[in-house]
């Protein structure tokens, strides 16, 4: 029997530079853009863990802590926090990374992901 993957094996970081097209009317990063980036990271974490295509089934928590602005470097860090029979919980913490390398948290989210079989149905089978 093959040993399952550890959460560390599916850890994912993604980096975005905020540009003017990403801003809302208040010249801050549009929340919907950040949520889209978060969803992508959650999907990559779950896919790496399960070895399958995945889908988002729920957002358990999504907290906007601080704003981000044009030219900010956004770092999204995703890690697996729970694995059930068919679902996985992924925690994504988003930061603004400053030129000196320090990071300030701007968002924390928990997404529930499900691995899919060939018929796009939830499956407990891990590859």
Task: Report each predicted region and the residues it spans.
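Hot-dog-fold acyl-thioester-processing enzymes
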Residues: 2-58, 113-127
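HotDog/MaoC-like acyl-thioester-processing domains
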Residues: 2-13, 69-70, 81-127
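Short, well-ordered turn and helix-capping elements at secondary-structure junctions
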Residues: 18-22, 59-66, 96-98
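Conserved interaction-surface patches within small, structured recognition/assembly domains
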Residues: 57-67, 75-80
């Amino acid at each position: 029997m093959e040993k399952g993957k550890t959460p560390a094996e599916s850890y994912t970081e993604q980096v975005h530079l905020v540009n003017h097209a990403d801003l809302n009317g208040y010249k801050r990063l549009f929340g919907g853009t950040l949520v889209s980036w978060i969803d992508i990271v959650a999907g990559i974490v779950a896919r790496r863990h399960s070895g399958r295509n995945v889908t988002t089934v729920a957002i358990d928590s999504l907290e906007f802590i601080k704003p981000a602005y044009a030219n900010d470097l956004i770092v999204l860090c995703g890690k697996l926090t729970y694995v059930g029979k068919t679902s996985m919980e992924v925690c994504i913490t988003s930061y603004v990374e400053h030129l000196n390398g320090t990071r300030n948290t701007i968002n924390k989210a928990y997404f529930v992901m499900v691995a899919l079989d060939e018929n796009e149905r939830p499956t407990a089978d891990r590859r």
